């Protein structure tokens, strides 16, 4: 099996699927490039919410924590436990990365259901979760790939590449392809679930615009949280695996 053409084909697939579109979209023309304005607007809102919440959380910490401080400490403890479980005792430096991924995806997923889209009128289409666009999920998956390569090389040096011939050199092509397909699985899983959830809600609202879609929306909120947890857990597991060796 020729690994290089397969790897190039994998990258080409990632590039091709970046043009996947469902529904009507609003674009900005910047220079010679089309920029997906819906994704950027919602992403900026999500980033503003996260930065604002973080600023409030650390601005005036109390010895006897308030309800808000308790909530943020619980979130931090949850992310630390998740990182420690998947990565091991050397989890500390990776908590900010895993936490950022989890919180951005979690708030992005929920923004698709909770953001009052009609507040901001767009010439075409309407606002949606950033994670229902394949470009966003690929942009989240690729840094994860860089992170586990970096973790492995930092811990083991060039000896990290020895995992590709474990348990036998015959598996070298398969082990290499496994690393190149990880970002594909991460991005497609998140993109597919969030897009499907929003499409189901839109169809139900158009058919029965009253009480029936509400349970589906609550189910979507639950699914959105689960998808953020799955992405963060897998990202941490990949980093832990690269530091510990082939399993």
From Swiss-Prot:
Q: Where in the cell is it found?
A: Plastid, Chloroplast thylakoid membrane
User: Which keywords describe this protein according to UniProt?
Assistant: ATP synthesis, CF(0), Chloroplast, Hydrogen ion transport, Ion transport, Membrane, Plastid, Thylakoid, Transmembrane, Transmembrane helix, Transport
Please tell me one Gene Ontology term that the record gives under cellular component: proton-transporting ATP synthase complex
GO molecular-function term, one example from the UniProt record: proton-transporting ATP synthase activity, rotational mechanism
Q: Which InterPro entries match?
A: ATP_syn_F0_a_bact/chloroplast (IPR045082), ATP_synth_F0_asu (IPR000568), ATP_synth_F0_asu_AS (IPR023011), F0_ATP_A_sf (IPR035908)
Q: Which Gene3D superfamilies match?
A: ATP synthase, F0 complex, subunit A
Q: Which cysteines in this chain are paired by disulphide bridges?
A: none
Indicate yes or no for the key word Chloroplast.
yes
- What is the top-level taxon of the source organism? Eukaryota
Q: How does it sit in the membrane?
A: Multi-pass membrane protein
Span-the-membrane segments of this chain are 38-58, 95-115, 134-154, 199-219, 220-240
Q: Which Pfam families match?
A: ATP-synt_A
Instruction: Describe the task this protein carries out.
Output: Key component of the proton channel; it plays a direct role in the translocation of protons across the membrane.
Under the subunit heading, UniProt states:
F-type ATPases have 2 components, CF(1) - the catalytic core - and CF(0) - the membrane proton channel. CF(1) has five subunits: alpha(3), beta(3), gamma(1), delta(1), epsilon(1). CF(0) has four main subunits: a, b, b' and c.
Would you identify the family this protein belongs to, as annotated?
Belongs to the ATPase A chain family.
Extract the NCBIfam families matched here.
Answer: ATP_synt_6_or_A
Q: What is this protein called?
A: ATP synthase subunit a, chloroplastic
Q: Which organism is it from?
A: Chloranthus spicatus
Question: Which taxonomic lineage is given here?
Answer: Eukaryota, Viridiplantae, Streptophyta, Embryophyta, Tracheophyta
Q: Which gene specifies this protein's sequence?
A: atpI
């Amino acid at each position: 099996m020729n690994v290089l053409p397969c790897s190039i084909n994998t990258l080409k697939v990632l590039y091709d699927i970046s043009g996947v579109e469902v529904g009507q979209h609003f674009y900005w023309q910047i220079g010679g490039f089309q920029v997906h304005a819906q994704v950027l607007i919602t992403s900026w809102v999500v980033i503003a919410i996260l930065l604002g919440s973080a600023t409030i959380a650390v601005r005036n910490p109390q010895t006897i924590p308030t309800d808000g401080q308790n909530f943020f400490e619980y979130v931090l403890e949850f992310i630390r436990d998740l990182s420690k479980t998947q990565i091991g005792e050397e989890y500390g430096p990776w908590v900010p990365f895993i936490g950022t991924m989890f919180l951005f995806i979690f708030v992005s997923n929920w923004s698709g259901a909770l953001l009052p889209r009609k507040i901001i009128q767009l010439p075409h289409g309407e606002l949606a979760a950033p994670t229902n666009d394949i470009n966003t999920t690929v942009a989240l998956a690729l840094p994860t790939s860089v992170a586990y390569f970096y973790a492995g090389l930092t811990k083991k040096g060039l000896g990290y590449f020895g995992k590709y011939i474990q348990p036998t050199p015959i598996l070298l092509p398969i082990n290499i392809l496994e690393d190149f397909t990880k970002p594909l699985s991460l991005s497609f899983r998140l993109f597919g679930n969030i897009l499907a959830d929003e499409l189901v809600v839109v169809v139900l609202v158009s058919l029965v615009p009253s009480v029936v879609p509400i349970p589906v929306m609550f189910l979507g909120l639950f699914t959105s949280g689960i998808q953020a947890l799955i992405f963060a857990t897998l990202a941490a597991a990949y980093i832990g695996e690269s530091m510990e060796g082939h399993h």
